[in-house]
Curated annotation (Swiss-Prot):
Name of the protein in its database record: 2,3-bisphosphoglycerate-independent phosphoglycerate mutase
Protein purpose: Catalyzes the interconversion of 2-phosphoglycerate and 3-phosphoglycerate.
Pathway annotation: Carbohydrate degradation; glycolysis; pyruvate from D-glyceraldehyde 3-phosphate: step 3/5
Pfam family, one: Metalloenzyme
HAMAP family, per the entry: GpmI
UniProt GO molecular function: manganese ion binding; phosphoglycerate mutase activity
One of the GO BP terms on file: glucose catabolic process
Gene designation: gpmI
Length: 511
């Protein structure tokens, strides 16, 4: 019998705003999206701030978006959890932090703090670094070194100097800490197994290898002179007057990695924590007996201590589909595969019974503006075969392009990215409709809707604009004022399945 699948199609980084300047979503020629928008019930959803468990006004992101979508409720994000812990004094009593600090005091060794040096709030927040510096001062830790990963992606591309100056003020204020290395996140936070990048960051931190500077700001100035901005700054070493590195990571040191988002923290963490690491030769000085702390749970593969342990999410969308004996497919290209699997399942790595996954490799290019279509056509071809084969009751699909190309801050490639996705969307939705199925077309957060600032500069960060939702079923009405946490209840509603009590979101379909 022909399956009539209900598909949740996530156009990553695709939000709506009226102003067309710098707006790749508005400027793109997207006949399929426009046709569905005009023909079927539609509304807009909030995908940022408190609607997704973030601080008010904080832009959403893919991890947060998929967690909320899959959970069918507002999920309190790590950023909010840590902020509350700082505010209520719980941060200073955190046993894992205190154990790391005691470890270096007992061994007479150094504490290293590393993470993304910005207030972007997507992977980290600089205030969490300040809280760690304050705690180190309070606990009497003398040797504290900071390895700053420069952002330029979740914040403006040339904002590193302001964060470094602010950090230097805090170091002065607390009387503890020195900047030891700086590295663009392109190197230190790779997630695509481009180990040559990670190796450069590792060797700067452990061997003191790389360009050397007396002053962190001089490092940034020098990079800017060569047209290399924050995200891409080569791993660089800050040295003392005699040319020796301020600090390298050595045996018995402690590391606190203050990023809270796992995906871009895993590879560099594995480099330090895994005994059977084989991705590159770590050399004779690879530090032993490190006390390695992850701010949150990064992955089963990372052998470190976790300061803020995960909160379990029960009865996520995938689990409910599985409990009712439905077959489900998760499909995406590499860049968003963890999002439609791990994050969509509430932080669970394993598949549910009846769940299949298809991973299509993302193209190997330095930056995706060079190939705006990415692997969208390959994802589409793979999915069309599965729809034709009548195997699945539910499909969860992500198109990465509007987000990944939007991060370039380049308008033309981002328009091309949106257009490629629209072409693919048309094929997929029409195939689903031909089977008598239903598509829910939506997004997880904004990005491609604002790739230029009003004065024409690249805008590489996400946005706080609302995201669309279209349900390709005639004769229903969708309510306004919804959130991402309402999508799973809507999908269950369309499948005729009961909503579990843990899902506090509400179906968007007006009864």
């Amino acid at each position: 019998m022909s399956k009539q699948p209900v598909a949740l199609i996530i156009l990553d980084g695709f939000a709506l705003r009226d102003e067309t300047y710098g707006n790749a979503v508005a400027q793109a020629n997207k006949p399929n999206f426009d046709r569905y928008w005009n023909e079927y019930p539609h509304t807009m959803l909030k995908a940022c701030g408190e609607a997704v468990g973030l601080p008010e006004g904080q832009m959403g992101n893919s991890e947060v978006g998929h967690l909320n979508i899959g959970a069918g409720r507002i999920v309190y994000q790590s950023l909010t959890r840590v902020n509350i812990a700082i505010r209520e004094g719980e941060f200073d009593r955190n046993e894992t932090f205190l154990a790391a600090m005691n470890h270096v005091k007992q061994h007479g060794t150094s504490l290293h703090l590393f993470g993304l040096l910005s207030d972007g709030g997507v992977h980290s927040h600089i205030h969490h670094l300040y809280a760690l510096l304050r705690l180190a001062a309070k606990e009497g830790v003398k040797r504290v070194y900071i390895h700053g990963f420069l952002d330029g992606r979740d914040v403006g591309p040339q904002t590193a100097p302001q964060y470094i100056k602010e950090l230097q003020e805090k170091i002065k204020e607390y009387g503890v800490g020195e900047i030891a290395t700086l590295s663009g996140r392109y190197y230190s936070m790779d997630r695509d197994k481009r180990w040559d990048r990670v190796e450069k960051a590792y060797r700067a931190m452990v061997y003191g290898e790389g360009p050397t500077y007396r002053d962190p700001l001089e490092c940034i100035e020098d990079s800017y002179k060569h047209g290399i901005y924050d995200e891409f700054v080569l791993p660089s070493v800050i040295v003392r007057e005699d040319g020796r590195p301020v600090a390298t990571i050595q045996d018995n040191d402690a590391i606190i990695f203050y990023n809270f988002r796992p995906d871009r923290a895993i590879q560099i963490s594995n480099t330090f924590t895994n005994e059977d690491f084989r991705e590159f030769d770590r050399g004779p000085k690879h530090p032993k007996h490190l006390f390695f702390v992850c701010l949150t749970h990064f992955s089963e593969t990372v052998k470190g201590y976790v300061a803020f342990k995960p909160t379990n999410l029960d009865n996520t969308l995938g689990e409910v589909l599985s409990q009712h004996g439905l077959r489900q497919l998760r499909i995406a290209e590499t860049e968003k595969y963890p999002h439609v699997t791990f994050f969509m399942s509430g932080g669970r790595e394993e598949k549910f019974p009846g769940e299949d996954r298809i991973l299509i490799n993302s193209p190997k290019v330095p930056t995706y503006d060079l190939k705006p279509e990415m692997s969208a056509y390959e994802v589409t071809d793979a999915l069309l075969k599965e729809i034709e084969a009548d195997k699945y009751d539910a499909i969860i699909l992500n198109y990465a392009n509007p987000d990944m190309v939007g991060h370039s801050g380049k308008l033309e490639p981002t328009i091309k990215a949106v257009e490629a996705v629209d072409e693919c969307l048309g094929k997929v939705v029409d195939a689903i409709l031909a089977k008598g199925g239903i598509a829910i077309i939506t997004a997880d957060h904004g990005n491609a809707d604002e790739v230029l600032t009003p004065d024409g500069k690249p805008q590489t960060a996400h946005t706080t604009n609302p995201v669309p939702v279209i349900v390709t079923k005639k004769g229903i009405k969708l309510r306004d004022g919804g959130i991402l946490g309402d999508l799973a209840p809507t999908m269950l509603d369309l499948l005729g399945l009961p909503q579990p009590k843990e899902m506090t979101g509400k179906s968007l379909i007006v009864k």
